[in-house]
From Swiss-Prot:
Belongs to the class-II aminoacyl-tRNA synthetase family. This is Glycine--tRNA ligase. It comes from Methanopyrus kandleri (strain AV19 / DSM 6324 / JCM 9639 / NBRC 100938). NCBIfam families: glyS_dimeric, PRK04173.1. Its EC number is 6.1.1.14.
C-alpha cells in the first residue's frame, strides 16, 4: 500500500458516507465521529457477525444495560482509583498530551506503565517540548478517564458513563447464574457504547472518546482446566508475541497452533480458544493472517483486574500494530469486589467428590451490633462467606473487607461452627474477550481497500450495499422495470442501491468504489424475456439470469454457496 492510504480511505469514507467528523458545523471535536449511511450499515454487519459467533454459535446470553452507572459500581470495581492515564500540558499554548504517548512518539521508547514521576524525569532529561508550539511542558499528573455527572438535581448521586460494558454483567451475576441453570461455564455478552475521556485523541477513529464495545464475560470454574469445545479452534495457527520475546532485543513472533501454545504453557485453554475464534472472525472480514498477531500484555501495562491479557492486534499502514481485541483473565476480581462492597453473595456452587469437614465463623449479632453499628449486617455477611479447613485458622480474630475497607473483627464477635459439607461455594473466574468495533471497522476498510483501483473489495456478505440495480438507459420503461427489481430485492432482505444517473460505466465505477459486490442491469433484453445481467465487482464478468430466480441467485452468491460462473449464462 502507498503511504497515503489512510488519507485515501478517509477521503472516500467522508465523501461516500462511511465516516464523518462529528459536530463539523461547530468546528468538530477530537475523538468523536459519526457513521454515515454506509458506515452504519457496515458497522451493523460487523456487530451481527460478532453476534453470530458469540450468541448463536457459543450460545451466550445477551443483555442490555444503562450507559450511565452509579458511582458505587466503579468504586467497587477499582475504576475510580485505577482508571487513570498520565497527563501533561503545554504551559504556553495550553494543549494537553498523554505523557507516555508523547514520550514514545518523540523518543521512541516504551513508556507504557511508567509512573508520573518516571515520565517527569524522562521529559526533563530529554528536554521534551510541546510538539504544537515548542513551549515548556508542565508537571505530569494523573487523569481519570471516566466522564462523571450527578444523577438527579442539585447534589445528586454521583454517576459515571461506563468506560466498559462489563460491570453491568458482574453486578447481575446472581440472576444470570440462575438463568444458566447454575452450571458453569456460561457466557454473557453485551454490545453498546463505552466512554473514555481520552486526554488527547490523535489517531482518527482508532482512539475515540465514545466508542462501541462488544464484550463477553465467560464465567468458569478455575479448577476445571479444560474449556468445552476447545477443539473447535485448537488448530488455528496464530502469530504469538509473548512477554519473553518482547523483552529480547530481537524478539520474534512465534507461529504455532493454539493447541501447541496451550501445550507449551504459553496460554490457558480459555484464552487460546478465544484467540483462535477471533482470528477466524477477522479472516472472514477480509483481514489476512499476515496482518494479525496475538501479543501478551507486559505486567506493567496490565489492567488492575487482570492476571493475564492478550491483545489481538492488526497491522495498519499508518498506525502499525493496533489492538482491536483484548482477551483478559479477570480471575475472580470483579465478583469478589462487588460481593465485598455490596454485601451480596456472588459465588457459585460446586459439588464435592467426597464430603469434607469445614469450619466457619457464625456472627454473634449481640456483639457485632453495638460494636459496629450500621456496618454490622455487612460484616456479618462477610463473615458468613469465610470457610476454613481447620479451627485454628479462625481463632484470634478475623479481617474482612467491607465497602473497600479492611475491618478487624475480634473473636468474641463470632462463634466457630464445625460442619460436614457435600459442596462448596466459590467465586467463578472470568475470561473477557473485549472487541473494539470502531477499530475493527477501520481495519476492515483498510484491508479490503484496493489502492490501485481505489475501491473497496469487501467480502460479499460484509458489503454495506449488497446489490446495485441500474437501468441500462434512462428510458421510462427500463427505469420502471429497474425500480420494480430494486423494490423486490429490498423486500427479499437485500441492501440495494438504485442508480440511473450518468452512463452505465460511471454507475459501475461508483458502485465499485463503495464495494458493491454485484450489480444488476435492466437492458433491452430484459423487456423482451424478463432476464437481467449480474455483474461481478472483482472480475467485471457478467451472467444473465431470469428475474424470477434473481433473489435466490444473489443470495447464493452473497452467502458463498454459489460460484459466479455457475450463476447464469455468461454474457
Amino acid at each position: 500500500m502507498t503511504e497515503d492510504v489512510y488519507e485515501r480511505i478517509m477521503e472516500i469514507a467522508r465523501r461516500r458516507g462511511f465516516i464523518l467528523p462529528a459536530f463539523r458545523i461547530y468546528g468538530g471535536a477530537r475523538g468523536f465521529y459519526d457513521y454515515g449511511p454506509l458506515g452504519a450499515l457496515l458497522k451493523r454487519k460487523i456487530e451481527e457477525k460478532w453476534r453470530e459467533y458469540y450468541v448463536h454459535k457459543e450460545g451466550f446470553m445477551e443483555i442490555e444495560a444503562p450507559n450511565l452507572l452509579i458511582g458505587e459500581v466503579f468504586e467497587a470495581s477499582g475504576h475510580v482509583e485505577h482508571f487513570i492515564d498520565p497527563m501533561t500540558h503545554c504551559s504556553e499554548c495550553g494543549e494537553f498530551f498523554r505523557a507516555d504517548h508523547l514520550a514514545e512518539e518523540e523518543l521512541g521508547v516504551d513508556a507504557e506503565g511508567m509512573s508520573p514521576e518516571e515520565l517527569e524525569d524522562l521529559i526533563r532529561e530529554h528536554d521534551l517540548r510541546c510538539p504544537e508550539c515548542g513551549g515548556e511542558l508542565a508537571e505530569v499528573t494523573e487523569f481519570n478517564l471516566m466522564f462523571d455527572t450527578n444523577i438527579g438535581p442539585k447534589e445528586g448521586r454521583t454517576g459515571y458513563l461506563r468506560p466498559e460494558t462489563a460491570q453491568a454483567i458482574f453486578i447481575q451475576f446472581k440472576d444470570l447464574y440462575r438463568w444458566a441453570r447454575q452450571k458453569l461455564p456460561f457466557g454473557v455478552v453485551q454490545i453498546g457504547r463505552a466512554y473514555r475521556n481520552e486526554i488527547s485523541p490523535r489517531q482518527g477513529v482508532i482512539r475515540l472518546r465514545e466508542f462501541t464495545q462488544a464484550e463477553a464475560e465467560v464465567f468458569f470454574d478455575p479448577e476445571e482446566k479444560e474449556y468445552p469445545g476447545f477443539e473447535r479452534y485448537a488448530d488455528e495457527v496464530l502469530k504469538f508475541y509473548p512477554i519473553e520475546e518482547q523483552r529480547k532485543e530481537n524478539g520474534e513472533m512465534l507461529e504455532m497452533s493454539v493447541r501447541e501454545a496451550v501445550e507449551e504453557g504459553m496460554v490457558s485453554q480459555p484464552i487460546g480458544y478465544f484467540l483462535g475464534l477471533t482470528k477466524r472472525m477477522l479472516n472472514e472480514m477480509g483481514v489476512p493472517n499476515e496482518a494479525i498477531r496475538s501479543r501478551q500484555h507486559l505486567p506493567e501495562e496490565r489492567a488492575h483486574y487482570a492476571s493475564d491479557c492478550w491483545d489481538v492486534e492488526v497491522k495498519l499502514e499508518r498506525f502499525g500494530w493496533v489492538e482491536v481485541v483484548g482477551i483478559a483473565d479477570r480471575t475472580d476480581y470483579d465478583l469478589k469486589k462487588h460481593s465485598e462492597h455490596s454485601g451480596e453473595d456472588l459465588r457459585a456452587f460446586r459439588e464435592l467428590e467426597e464430603p469434607k469437614i469445614v469450619y466457619r465463623p457464625e456472627p454473634v449479632m449481640k456483639e457485632l451490633g453495638p460494636r459496629f453499628k450500621s456496618d454490622a449486617p455487612k460484616i456479618a455477611e462477610a463473615l458468613r462467606r469465610i470457610t476454613a479447613e481447620s479451627e485454628d485458622e479462625l481463632k484470634g480474630g478475623l479481617t474482612v473487607e467491607v465497602d473497600g475497607k479492611e475491618v478487624e473483627v475480634p473473636p468474641e464477635c463470632y462463634e466457630i461452627v464445625k460442619e460436614k459439607v457435600t459442596g462448596e461455594r466459590f467465586y467463578p473466574h472470568v475470561i473477557e474477550p473485549s472487541y473494539g468495533i470502531d477499530r475493527i471497522l477501520y481495519c476492515v476498510l483498510e484491508h479490503n481497500f484496493d489502492p490501485e483501483e481505489g475501491v473497496f473489495r469487501f467480502p460479499a456478505w460484509l458489503a454495506p450495499i449488497e446489490v446495485g440495480v441500474f437501468p441500462l438507459l434512462k428510458r421510462s420503461d427500463m427505469v420502471e422495470y429497474a425500480r420494480r427489481v430494486a423494490r423486490m430485492l429490498r423486500e427479499e432482505g437485500f441492501t440495494v442501491e438504485y442508480d440511473d444517473s450518468g452512463s452505465i460505466g460511471r454507475r459501475y465505477a461508483r458502485a465499485d468504489e463503495i464495494g458493491v459486490p454485484y450489480c444488476v442491469t435492466v437492458d433491452h433484453e430484459t423487456l423482451e424475456d424478463d432476464t437481467v445481467t449480474i455483474r461481478d465487482r472483482d472480475t467485471t464478468e457478467q451472467v444473465r439470469v431470469e428475474v424470477d430466480e434473481l433473489a435466490d441467485v444473489l443470495r447464493g452468491l452473497i452467502d458463498g454457496d454459489l460460484e459466479f460462473e455457475e450463476a447464469g449464462d455468461p454474457v
